[in-house]
Structure formats: C-alpha cells, structure tokens
Amino acid sequence: MAQRVAVNDGAAGSKRTSRVRVAVRLRPYMDKQDEKSEGSCVRGLGPQKLEIINWRNATETLQYQFDVFHGEETTQQEVFLTSVKPILPHILNGQNASVFAYGPTGAGKTHTMLGSQEQPGVIPRAVKEVFNLVGAQKKEQDGWEYSIGMSYLEIYNEKVLDLLSPGSQDLPIREDKDRNILIPGLTHTPLSSFADFDTHFIPASLNRTTASTKLNQRSSRSHAILLIKVVKSQRGPPHRQQTGKLYLVDLAGSEDNRRTGNQGIRLKESGAINLSLFTLSKVVDALNTGAGGRVPYRDSKLTRLLQDSLGGSAHSVMITNIAPEYKYYFDTFSALNFAAKSKQIVNRPFVRETVLAPTIAPGKRTREEQEAGGSGEPQNKRSKEGKKAEHSPSPPLHPQSSPDSSVLDRLLALEKMMMGSAERERLNLLKTVAQSRKEIQMLKEKQKELEDKANMFNKQKETTEKESKDALLFKTDLPPLHRKQSTAAKPRKQQAVVTPLQVSQVQPLQQCAVVCKPSQTLVKKKRVQTEVCDGKENIGVDLPPVEDVNWESRLDPALLEQSRKKILQTLNSGSLKELKSLQQIGDKKAKLIMGWREINGDFTQVEDLKKIEGVTVKRFSSFIKANILSSMGK
C-alpha cells in the first residue's frame, strides 16, 4: 500500500516556504524596432535594480528591485546559471520546480526558453543538467533507481493540445484526491539520455502554433509547457519512491491588436492569449491579497496548469522579458508591475514520497504454537517474549517428529470424503450433459419439421402467383359496373358522400391526364360498395384492390402548351389584379412585371419571366408548376 509522506522543516516542525524568485531580462536595443529613434526607456542600475521613465512625469524615473536583473549583454548561460540551475536539485528529492518566461510579444521569451543551436536556451540546458544530476547521484547512492520522462503540450485558443501527438484533440484537466493537477491522455515519453530528449523535443516544437504579426515575425500563438518527470525508487526495503516534476513554460506574449494589425484567426488567438494572461494577473493579485479569498485558478486553463507554480508546492522562477524601445513602454511598464507583485507570492514545497508498506499474510500456526496459545497467557506477554527471542541466539533446527496416528486417520478420512464428493459431482455433471444433448437433438428434429412445412408453403404460394400472372395476360381492363337494387324500405335523407375515384364520373381533363396501369401482381378481387349522392342506390363494383393497381400521373403535351399560352397571355395583357391572381405573384412582383412590359414590350415566352429581378430559376420552376396545376383545376 502506498502512503504519502509529508516532509517538515527539521527541528521547527513547520512546512518550509519558498518565495517565487523573479528575474528580469532586458532585450538588446534594436534600431529597426525604434522607428522614431527615441532611444531606450529602461536602464539597469546593478545586478538587481533597474529604472524606467515615469510616463506621468518625464523628469522622474521609477525604480524596481528584483532577485536578478539580466542586462542587454547577459548570455544564455549566465541566465541559466544564476536563475534556473539552483532549483533543479529539488526535483531529485521528490519536489517540484517551475520556470516560466513572461512578457509582451517580441520581448524575447521564446529565445530565452528555447534559444538557438549556437546559444541554447533554458529548456535544453535544464534537461541536460537533470541528466547530469541523475548520473552523479547514481554514483553516490547505489540503492536507488531513476527514470526520466517528458510530456509536451500547448494551450491554443483555450484548448490543451499534445505536441508529442499532433493528431490529438482537446485534453481535459483533472485533479486527484491529493489536489495534484493531471491531464489524462497526455503522452508521456521515457527518456534514456539527452540525445533521446533532443530526438523527441525538436519535432514536437515544430508542431507549436506560430504566425507572423506586425510586431513579431515569428510570434507564438500559444502557451507551451514542457514537463520533465523524475521518479526515484529505492531498491531495498522500505521501497520508498520519490517523484519530482520540472515545469518549463514559454508563455505567449500579450498583444495590442491596434499595433499588431491582427484580423480573423489572429484576432481570435490574441483574444485567448490576453484573456489567459489577464486571469494570470488576477491569480497573482488574489495571492498577494491573502485573507483566504478565492484564487481564480479555474478561470483559465493556463492558470489551472500553473496552480502548482503560483501559490502551490513548487520552487518557482519567473523570468520577465522586457523590451527597451519606447513603443513597448506600456507593455514593459505592465510587465514590471506584474513581476513586482509576483515576487511576493510564497509557495510551500514538500517531498512527494510513497512508501510501499509490506503486506504479510497471516500464516498457519504450528501445533506447538497452538498448544502454547492454549495455555491462557496474555497476548502482550507472548509478544514481549517474542521480542526477547529475537535478540537471543536462535536454537539449532531439529528434524520434525512424525505426526500422531489420530492426525493420519483424520487426514485419510478427509481425503476419502473429498474424493467421494468429487466423484458424485462428476456423475451429476455427466448426467446433465447427456440430458442437454437429448434436448438439443429434439430441438433439431422440431426445427427440421418446421423447415419442411415452410418449404411446402412457399411452393404453394409460387404456384398461386404463377396462375394469377397467367390469368392477367388475358384480362387487363377493369370489370364493368353492376347495379344492385336498393334494399332500403324507406327513402333515406340525402347525405353528402365522397365518391370514390373508381366510380366517379371522369372529367375530360382527367381523361387526358390520368392513365391507369393495372398491376401484374393481382391476386384476388375486392368488392367495393359505394353510394350514389341521392342515397337511394347502392352500386357494387368488382375492382382490384387499390394497393394492387399502379397509378401514374402523366400530363398531355397539348394541355400543357395550352396552359403555358394562357399564362403568357395573362403576363402580356393582364391588369394588376389579373397578374396578382396568378399563383406566387404578389403586389410587388405584379408591379415589376408591368414595369418590365412598359420598358421591354410583351413577353415572347413564359421563360422571359426569369429576366425580372428576384425571379430565380428555382422560383420560376415553382411558379410554372403551381400555375399549370391551377389552370388544370379550373
């Protein structure tokens, strides 16, 4: 069973605290970024102090003091040695460490964290140092095993994406019972050497979302977080296991969209970046305020993942990158104020250690122990004697004496009983199997009988259908109508009855437009009884079922042409009222038709209606269908 071991601060007995260390790095002055040649607005005053011009009063300056100030000429190695390297040994002792770069866009955050091949940044130097520390501890402490792994993700538009698995979707953020933040489904890649890390990290970095803006040719459009996990396991008892994590975070820079010229997707990305950084500032303000108030970690996925770094249990270092040019003045001013508030945050790191407690199963007591247990001595007395016996030299081992005859008799009886029960179970099982086989055979015979009946029925059905088809070859017209005398004793009142289509008087239009095709699958006749409108006679008609007759609607070309001429005549000579009487022609369309006639003359064909504004091909087709059917109904 694994249990969590809290580590206290030596003799004091209270948890250690670790303040967030803040380092400020000033990017070198760039002429092309200073369009007005105004010079630098920031100046260093020492290894920890700097000053910036007060925008409210140009004759004054504002001074800031941090843990470390890196000037324009500071190298990548100096930044790593002074700010990052001191916290790395903590992860080999089961604690967490965090390094993140903060600042406006174009201030050099990605250069500080990644660097280049000639000047590696914080990430490659830190990972290499972790492998060096593990190698050194392996030589000093022989009873421990070490395993190193990495995970790499980005937060793009408030979506957590796995950079080691580019095809992954938005990953959820969870919290376990110990309040540790974790991401289910995030790829964890074991590492054996720094070269192995290089193989995985470089392609994954290319998967990160970047784009060009007016202020930065290669602007990061997402926050990137690299997690290095070191697990230290003890080979022998008590089999302790310590887990340390190193978070290396490259934040995207805050942007002023009026200067970057962001539009479309760039504008959406900028909004997500600024919102997450604003939530980060709210978290810092809440931590500085204290008083047990709510800290809005859950308001953003970035602050949710940085929860351990700010006010959590990690040794944290924030590298604030600033730009010296005047056009970045307010971005630099805001970044310095944020850094000044962040250095007041206090974390409480502890060792994450699990101890595998050995689980010893209670063994059977020997006969001598049972006899000793039956003597009525208290349990604590026996345990004291057992402790004394541990310190005394153990007696020599004696060969075990032969068991008593009564014990042998009991064992033989038990064996016979067990063998007998097994034989009975075997016989019962065989009987059950035989019965099941018999039932299966009966079911098979019954199934065969049912199949024979089904085949016979299908043959009879096929014969009947064939005879029906042969009969239809000589009979295609409907049977004549037969009159039947009314059986009513008294004349009933006249009532409205809907006359079926088969017996109603066929109109001339229906004679030319509707054709009945008798179905060839006619099986039986159905007698249909209906009533004439006067309610005095019943007419019996032997007709095929309606579902067995296929009706097909077909328009006579002459009738269709007649309808189109009638519509064309209305379009050319109709008044406003007559035009509105056409289907799908309202007041507006009627006025447009009359205006078109005055300008272009009469319509030569109905298709000319498509030339009028607002009459599309689809509307014209619907217009033709509706008016042709309407004219037929008349």
Curated annotation (Swiss-Prot):
SMART domains: KISc. Residues 357-406 are annotated as: Disordered. It comes from the Eukaryota. Residues 19-345 form the Kinesin motor domain. Gene3D superfamilies: AF1531-like domain, Kinesin motor domain. Ubiquitinated, leading to its subsequent proteasomal degradation. ATP binds at G103, P104, T105, G106, A107, G108, K109, T110. SUPFAM superfamilies: P-loop containing nucleoside triphosphate hydrolases, RuvA domain 2-like. Residues 379-391 have a biased composition (Basic and acidic residues). One of its GO terms (biological process) is axonogenesis. Residues 421-471 form a coiled coil. One of its GO terms (cellular component) is kinesin complex. It is found in: Nucleus; Cytoplasm, Cytoskeleton. The keyword Nucleus applies. One of its GO terms (molecular function) is ATP binding. Keywords: ATP-binding, Coiled coil, Cytoplasm, Cytoskeleton, DNA-binding, Microtubule, Motor protein, Nucleotide-binding, Nucleus, Ubl conjugation. InterPro entries: Kinesin-like_fam (IPR027640), Kinesin_motor_CS (IPR019821), Kinesin_motor_dom (IPR001752), Kinesin_motor_dom_sf (IPR036961), P-loop_NTPase (IPR027417), RuvA_2-like (IPR010994). The keyword ATP-binding applies. Belongs to the TRAFAC class myosin-kinesin ATPase superfamily. Kinesin family. Kinesin family member that is involved in spindle formation and the movements of chromosomes during mitosis and meiosis. Binds to microtubules and to DNA. This is Kinesin-like protein KIF22.
